[in-house]
A protein has these predicted regions:
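N-terminal beta1-alpha1 ligand-phosphate binding loop
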Residues: 27-65
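Glycine-rich phosphate/pyrophosphate-binding loop and the adjoining helix
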Residues: 31-36, 57-60, 163-218
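A short beta-strand-loop structural module common to alpha/beta enzyme folds
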Residues: 65-78
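Structural motif
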Residues: 76-84, 187-194
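Helix-loop-strand module that forms the ligand-binding subsite of alpha/beta enzymes
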Residues: 84-165
Length: 218
């Protein structure tokens, strides 16, 4: 009788554990169709840009009220970042797209200043505070050089983005695969198509990321 009771208890707890593990984890981030998207435009002079401006226009047209675009060149021409305003913008975002041209194998100075000021003040030595835990970062990069220039045996685009990736991963953000386009120069006769295809890749990545997160794989 005692043996039967013990077997029953073991089976009960095993079954209960399986039931719990099959339930959705309430702490998992589930990106809805209404996910909030924040774009940080790091181009130092967007008015003179063709590719970056076209990409932002397509994003705004596609997402409408779901998207908020912060043009750093317009907001901070003197490079004096309003840290509190930027943190407020970040607070409710699910996706943060860093849109910028690759300058000397890195981000433009204005975007770097934004990262330095906003993240430093946000964490104040407590980088594991979890404030970025449920946010996905997408580096959306336009590159003036050719695809061959950034293919092996040369260094790849991903290599140049490692410092950016490490920065956001160390504070707990999700780092999505970067989206980048080559030959993003005015002399490219197909620049409009290049910008549009870049936009399409961004949409595909966001949808893929939502699907992955919903499955608990993020």
């Amino acid at each position: 009788m005692k043996l039967f009771k013990n077997i029953f208890l073991v089976l009960f707890f095993v079954g209960f554990s399986v039931h719990l593990s099959s339930q959705p984890r309430t702490t998992d981030k589930i990106f809805s169709l209404e996910s909030k998207i924040l774009v940080i435009s790091g181009h130092p002079n967007l008015e003179k840009s063709k590719a970056n401006k076209a990409i932002l226009k397509e994003l705004e047209k596609h997402f409408g009220k779901q998207i908020s675009i912060r043009r750093l060149d317009k907001l901070y021409p003197n490079y004096q970042i309003n840290v509190k305003a930027e943190q407020e913008a970040i607070k409710n975002a699910d996706f943060i797209i860093l849109q910028f041209p690759l300058y000397w194998y890195g981000t433009p100075a204005l975007l770097k200043k934004w990262i330095d000021d906003v993240l430093y003040d946000y964490f104040k030595g407590n980088r594991l505070s979890g404030k970025f835990k449920d946010k996905a970062i997408i580096a959306s990069v336009t590159i003036g050089g050719s695809k061959e220039r950034y293919s092996p045996p040369n260094k790849t685009v991903e290599t140049y983005l490692i410092p950016l990736q490490e920065t956001f991963e160390v504070i707990g953000a999700g780092w999505a695969s970067p989206v980048y386009s080559f030959d993003a120069v005015p002399s490219n006769k197909n620049l409009s198509e290049t910008a549009f295809q870049h936009f399409v890749k961004l949409i595909d990545l966001i949808n893929e990321y939502k699907s992955t997160a919903a499955q608990g794989c993020w």
